[in-house]
Amino acid sequence: MKAAESYADYYKDRPESLLNLTGQTSYVDDLPLPEGTLFAVPVGAPSARGRSLQLDAREALALDPSVRVLTARDIPGENQLGYVLPDEPLIADGEWSYKGEVVALVLARDRSTARRAARLVRISGEELPPVLDAREAFARGDIIMQPLHLESGDVDRAFAEADFVVTGSCESDGQEHLYLETQAAIAIPEDGGRMYCISSTQGPTGVQKAISRVLGIPMAQVEVEARRLGGAFGGKEDQAAPWATLAALGAWYTGRPVKLVLNRAEDMVMTGKRHPYSSDFKIGLTKDGRILGFEVTYYQNSGACIDLSLAILWRTMFHVC
């Protein structure tokens, strides 16, 4: 921006600026709903890892006649969202792999009733120790693929010619995307077994594929509309698919429109983050500080499922080299 320009001049040609400034912008949570819409709230696993999952929904179902509680057994198609590896069930079945993983979906006539019912679902099972450290996972062989190697030049010669060789380790922590608009979707069943979904997503085709897979219907019968996003920063690429698919599952099961909007606490616990990394590095330098050689080993913490981890790992390596 030139020094003489004001911020108002700089943004005046952006068509959404006035709408955002005056609060007229519509997001998924602002849209008018069809009559009879149900509201969905996911129930999350209480700990980081476990098995022998058991649910008791009797209190939740007794709260209100409109309450429905869906589990993995209610999925008509495949209980799977993962495409690189089949490691991401839509709803946990028997085992769970992270705190907040969806173990059930509650539907009710309004959001308040759905949230109250979700709190009444009792969860039990055998808790297991989680693996939280990428180095530990690598040592155990618990990895998503074989290690990648990228080389350029003769690093051994560079270290031999260097005046100084420095080694060390570095930790780069995870980070929440913290988009202002949380994950949101509205699913509307249509004639002929079709499903229409409005999703706050950066990747509508991924949402379409996920709904098709879970409902067991052709992609041609699934229409996904991506509305204006209230921020995303990469957090609504593959990450938007589970919530839209859960809404679609509820709509498929009940034959009624279903709206699902995570609150902030749910969004921060239930969604993926920027990858944490551990790294060991070795740098060869001259006396005047010029880098002759650099060698680094990265340990990527990809979390409970692979998602976009491979693409992120490749990008990490390309950025270094």
Describe each model-derived feature in a short phrase:
Residues 38, 93, 181-186, 278:
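Short glycine-rich loop/turn motifs
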